[in-house]
Amino acid sequence: MDGEDFAGKAAAEAKGLNPGLIVLLVVGGPLLVFLIANYVLYVYAQKNLPPRKKKPVSKKKLKREKLKQGVPVPGE
């Protein structure tokens, strides 16, 4: 192998895309698409889905809250 031949190949490879840029595009592109799609779905869900139903409050907790407020609990 000649030194000139090696220098010619290096010059030809240098004209191509930077490998770091390729890795950045391959990893960053899908990641960016994923994040944007998640945001779009989140906004869509906030507008169109009904609000969550609240969990039923237990009678024990209801009694405790009424005692805190000073309201007499019926049956006692």
From Swiss-Prot:
Tell me the segments the record calls region Disordered: 51-76
Molecular function GO terms recorded:
DNA binding
Where does this protein have compositionally biased stretches of type Basic residues? 51-66
Principal location class: nucleus
- GO CC terms on record? nucleus
Motif Nuclear localization signal residues? 50-55
Task: Quote the subcellular location field of this record.
Answer: Nucleus
What keywords does the record list, in alphabetical order?
DNA-binding, Nucleus, Repressor, Transcription, Transcription regulation
Q: Which InterPro entries match?
A: S1FA_DNA-bd (IPR006779)
Q: Which GO terms describe its biological process?
A: regulation of DNA-templated transcription
The record describes the protein's role as: DNA-binding protein that specifically recognizes a negative element (S1F) within the RPS1 promoter.
Family, per the entry? Belongs to the S1FA transcription factor family.
- Name of the protein in question: DNA-binding protein S1FA1
Which species is listed as the source?
Answer: Arabidopsis thaliana (Mouse-ear cress)
